[in-house]
């Protein structure tokens, strides 16, 4: 008889009393501050329909979804039918993030305010390879305003996040900003083909997690030419500088509007 392990599954953690107490304190501060800004809480189910989840995170994200197999007779029928498709075996999955559930809620509840200010603090699950500082189950805290593209709304979100950090005792922190339209322009400027744009954006998003070398190796593994990878990384580094942002904003290229909106956001949040 095999020995029963007392450890949690790989990538999962137990939280004992002291950890739970600290987390409750932090979440209490987050909730108090966000609600002082007029944000309301939202909770969504742990399980979502796979049709809701699939296709929202790109091919890599889809592979990291935890799928829930059909039960009993339904699963047996699918297996007996021959070569079942993905949705024949499972049509539900664990929540991957809090953004897609928010989009579903906004689409489903037509009586929500036109400008819906919500925060959501819940665990999410990803079938990732566990590593130092990376887990398969972890908490996310999202705060968003839907129904507007105004930079004033973005500035309010930044202000709420900054106040949370100050309330928790942090003083030396940075809030990082990006703009998808500007990023797409930078990818094109580096000479990366349009059909590789999506994967490049996914890898760029990991820059703070895996570093420059990690981004370089992953883009190379996905078939992006080394010279174009170097050009992209150099362009990204230059784009972090305010002068470069102002130069881009003054132009009429594809990323100029994104640069102008980022500058407007910096001004509104100052």
Placement of each model-derived feature along the sequence:
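Extended, charged alpha-beta segments that form solvent-exposed binding/catalytic grooves
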Residues: 2-270
């Amino acid at each position: 008889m095999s020995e029963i392990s007392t450890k949690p599954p790989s990538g999962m953690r137990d939280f004992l009393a002291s950890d739970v107490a600290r987390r409750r304190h932090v979440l209490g501060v987050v909730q108090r501050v966000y609600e002082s800004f007029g944000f309301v809480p939202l909770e969504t189910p742990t399980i979502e329909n796979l049709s809701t989840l699939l296709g929202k995170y790109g091919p890599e994200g889809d592979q990291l979804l935890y799928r829930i197999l059909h039960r009993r007779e339904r699963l047996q029928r699918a297996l007996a039918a021959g070569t079942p498709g993905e949705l024949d075996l499972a049509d539900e999955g664990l929540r991957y993030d809090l953004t897609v559930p928010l989009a579903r809620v906004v689409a489903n509840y037509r009586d929500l305010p036109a400008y819906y200010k919500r925060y959501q603090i819940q665990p999410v699950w990803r079938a990732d390879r566990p590593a130092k500082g990376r887990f398969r189950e972890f908490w996310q805290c999202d705060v968003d305003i839907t129904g507007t593209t105004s930079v004033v709304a973005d500035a309010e979100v930044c202000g709420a996040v900054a106040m949370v950090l100050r309330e928790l005792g942090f003083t030396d922190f940075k809030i990082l900003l990006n703009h998808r339209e500007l990023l797409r322009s930078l990818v094109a400027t580096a000479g990366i083909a349009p059909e590789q744009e999506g994967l490049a954006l996914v890898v760029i998003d990991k820059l703070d997690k895996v570093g420059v070398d990690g981004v370089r190796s992953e883009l190379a593994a996905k078939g992006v030419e080394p010279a174009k990878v170097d050009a992209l990384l150099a362009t990204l580094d230059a784009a972090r500088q305010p002068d470069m942002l102002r130069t881009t904003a003054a132009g009429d290229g594809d990323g100029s509007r994104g640069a102008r909106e980022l500058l407007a956001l910096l001004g509104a949040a100052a």
